[in-house]
């Protein structure tokens, strides 16, 4: 299937190595270097130039003064690259494997047919998630830019996508780090001989508190609550002090201190760039796998564990006839791999030019999917144990979804195991490291985008810019730190990010495969890797992946999620508020399209053609070519 781009094709690269550039003294698209990386004459956005040394004063071959000056300005340095290839892989894995892999996949799996759910999940991964993942890695590595300035080289009219991504990242940072703060509060509370969520004798407990595992004879009623549930709801969240979304109450000083510590860790992990964050992920990306292995072995030895495993994997093939199962599979793989957040573009932009991003995409996607699958065993062996201890069905124990599955059900199970303090400490440390990895990545996507777009302002002041970003995210988190903050977290999670990111990636896929052209894109990949993507990838990028995304978007719009948290049902106006928050980021795309068409000179046809045609090196402002110094 041969496709023709809607914009004009770029001239093929003729400057393939340092010697070629030196011979011709030209500014051309850079290709692989002999060392496999970026030579000193290469500029981070994919253009290279080395001043001629063998042409003398021949006026016919002299380089224009403006170009010579430009080269002199940028020749002093290079774009930062990863210290080691494994730093990049661990960073991508740490970003893709997050808290959702632990709490969302197991729940979605058993809700949608158990083992039968793996079939639509794998299909959606092969035809939708992995192609998009591969596309973003290749784009970032070839053009060597963040999510804003990269559009000058693809299709300038869609530059608003980059600004949309930055706003979405701010919304995510506003609630995601609050969940990490909850885990940190649990971790601090775990340093006791007896975990505080095992008893009903604390100041936050109510008369309805009933301990399943008490040696006393107890009667469980419809109004009974477990100590773990009351610890989470009344002590950590203090949600009983809020009347709902319309009155979230005051700010919890305990959670505020926790999130301040979280943001401090984040700042000193990313303030110097990927060379430092690449070292931090050696701990934050590997530690969760050590803990998951320990918990898997421990869970498998618990009484009743097999009940949980059967409940998790027992296939219900009739479920595959339901549209909702396929929607959940598509949404799960998409949000698990995480294209559309600007992170993959940013991380790949620090790779060497001929790094095998195709192999990276397959390896990291496989690791992500396997982690989700194995996490199900970690969760459900413990849920089977809980069901055995309570003499209940696993479905009754597994009714909690989202964070409650971790902070109530799993926390309660850990508290009633031998060596409970040890397991609680490593479990909540694992949650914190999983969350930190994703936050490092999300903020790096924004930082790279802004520094690449405005290097003349921020290139020499990265530390101050990162500090400004972290402080902004902290103040943005204040509403989620209130007594009703959990209501805000749920609203932002469901409406502010999901639909907006889906829209971004849908437009991105169309812009790259239809406007930039899948033929040109495959040519770029061949220039980097030495081989061109096959027909499977081309068909996925042009047709299958956009349909995959459109399918999820339409499903969401037709059946928006009904918001409910604990016993609280969200008011009707909260749906409108959610859509407004989501639209506030996506509006950047049509706004920039309008701005571009209005400010571009010429007739309407000339404006459109110029706006969808990649800019040449001489058209890109000097500020966009100057080095992102870190």
Swiss-Prot record:
One of its GO terms (molecular function) is monoatomic cation channel activity. Phosphorylation at Thr-276 increases 5-HT uptake and is required for cGMP-mediated SERT regulation. One of its GO terms (biological process) is platelet aggregation. The modification Phosphothreonine is found at residue 276. InterPro entries: Na/ntran_symport, Na/ntran_symport_serotonin_N, SNS_sf. Residues 616-624 are annotated as: Interaction with RAB4A. Na(+) 1 binds at residues 94, 97, 434, 437-438. NCBIfam families: Na_transp. This is Sodium-dependent serotonin transporter. It comes from Cavia porcellus.
């Amino acid at each position: 299937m041969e496709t023709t781009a809607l914009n004009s094709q770029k001239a093929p690269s003729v400057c393939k190595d340092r010697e070629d550039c030196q011979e011709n003294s030209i500014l051309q698209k850079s290709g692989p270097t002999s060392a496999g990386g970026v030579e000193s004459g290469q500029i981070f956005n994919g253009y290279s130039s080395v001043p001629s040394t063998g042409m003398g004063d021949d006026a016919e071959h002299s380089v224009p003064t403006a170009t010579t000056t430009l080269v002199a300005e940028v020749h002093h340095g290079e774009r930062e690259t990863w210290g080691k290839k494994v730093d990049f892989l661990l960073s991508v894995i740490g970003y893709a494997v997050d808290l959702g892999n632990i709490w969302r996949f197991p729940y979605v799996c058993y809700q949608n047919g158990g083992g039968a759910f793996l079939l639509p999940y794998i299909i959606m991964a092969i035809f939708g998630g992995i192609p998009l993942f591969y596309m973003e890695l290749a784009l970032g590595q070839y053009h060597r830019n963040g999510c804003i300035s990269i559009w000058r080289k693809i299709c300038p009219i869609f530059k608003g996508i980059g600004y949309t991504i930055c706003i979405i990242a701010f919304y995510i940072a506003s609630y995601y780090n609050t969940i990490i703060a909850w885990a940190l509060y649990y971790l601090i509370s775990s340093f006791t001989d007896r975990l505080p969520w095992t008893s009903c004798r604390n100041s936050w407990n109510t008369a309805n508190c009933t301990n399943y595992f008490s040696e006393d004879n107890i009667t469980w009623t419809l109004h009974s609550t477990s100590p773990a549930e009351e610890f989470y709801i009344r002590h950590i969240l203090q949600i009983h002090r809020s009347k709902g979304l319309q009155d979230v109450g005051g700010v919890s000083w305990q959670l505020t201190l926790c999130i301040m510590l979280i943001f401090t860790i984040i700042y000193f992990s990313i303030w110097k760039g990927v060379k430092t964050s690449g070292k931090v992920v050696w701990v934050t990306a590997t530690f969760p796998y050590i803990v998951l292995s320990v918990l898997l072995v421990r869970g498998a030895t618990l009484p009743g564990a097999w009940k949980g495993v059967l409940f998790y994997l027992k296939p219900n093939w009739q479920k595959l006839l339901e549209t909702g199962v396929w929607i959940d599979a598509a949404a799960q793989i998409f949000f698990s791999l995480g294209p559309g957040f600007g992170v993959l573009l940013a991380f790949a932009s620090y790779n060497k030019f001929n790094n095998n991003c195709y192999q990276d995409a397959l390896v990291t996607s496989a690791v992500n999917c396997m982690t989700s699958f194995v996490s199900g065993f970690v969760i459900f062996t413990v849920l089977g144990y809980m069901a055995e201890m309570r003499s209940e069905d696993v479905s009754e124990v597994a009714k909690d979804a989202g964070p409650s599955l971790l902070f109530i059900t799993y926390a309660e199970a850990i508290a009633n195991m031998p060596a409970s303090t040890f397991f609680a400490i490593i479990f909540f440390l694992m949650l914190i490291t999983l969350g930190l990895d994703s936050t490092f990545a999300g903020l790096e996507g924004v930082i790279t985008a802004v520094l690449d777009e405005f290097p003349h302002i921020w290139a020499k002041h990265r530390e101050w810019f990162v500090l400004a970003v972290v402080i902004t995210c902290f103040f943005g988190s204040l509403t989620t730190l209130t007594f009703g903050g959990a209501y805000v977290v749920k609203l932002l999670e469901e409406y502010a990010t999901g639909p907006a990111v889906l829209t971004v990636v849908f437009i991105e896929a169309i812009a790259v495969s239809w406007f930039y052209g899948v033929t040109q894109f495959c040519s770029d990949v061949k220039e980097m890797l030495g081989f061109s993507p096959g027909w499977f990838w081309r068909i996925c990028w042009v047709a299958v992946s956009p349909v995959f995304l459109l399918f999820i978007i339409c499903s969401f719009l037709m059946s928006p999620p009904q918001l409910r948290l604990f016993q609280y049902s969200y008011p009707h106006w909260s749906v409108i508020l959610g859509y407004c928050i989501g639209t506030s980021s996506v509006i950047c795309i049509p706004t920039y399209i309008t701005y571009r068409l209005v400010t571009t000179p010429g007739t309407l046809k000339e404006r459109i053609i110029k706006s969808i045609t990649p800019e040449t090196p001489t058209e890109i402002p000097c500020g966009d070519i100057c080095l992102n110094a870190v």
